[in-house]
Amino acid sequence: TWGDTPKECYEATIRIISRAMDWLNEKTAGKAVFGGAKSSALDTGARREIATKLMPVVRGLIGADEKKAGHFDDSQAVLEFVCSNRLEELAGLGTSCPDHFLRTKIRPLVVDFDPAKPDIDATIAGLAQAVNDYRDGYAAYYEACKHPDSPAMRDPNAVVYLVPGVGMITFAKDKATARISG
């Protein structure tokens, strides 16, 4: 077992996680993360301005059946991922654990945005199609995997929207869930 008491279980969990983190840090020291940088992050003001323009548009596209709260994250870890060479490839792999699967669907939606040539109007113009394509993909996934006793398909909209050079936008039924989903 992990321990005879809740405290021993907690301490064992922390010990194992710390060992895993030490191992990972040792193996990745000095190496480019996510295939290195493909683009640079925009400055803080530009990131916030773009997120401020994108969020109400996305919310309008996905919130017809259920109101959504949004959250924007442009932390260093998020920017490292959304600016990386392997963003599309790794995002396409989908979630990494069952909890993520339940909260974030099978994968995020990578927004078509080029931080080297930021054209927010073109990005917004393409969002409806991107959202519809995501919904269609989710519905096809559900149909391929469902069983006779499966629950009805959940909301087919993406929860996580990754914007190169900008950050991550998440939407859920409330602010706390939107924040946790990232």
Model-predicted segments: where are they?
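Catalytic palm active-site di-aspartate
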Residues: 1
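Domain-length cofactor-binding catalytic modules of enzymes
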Residues: 7, 11-182
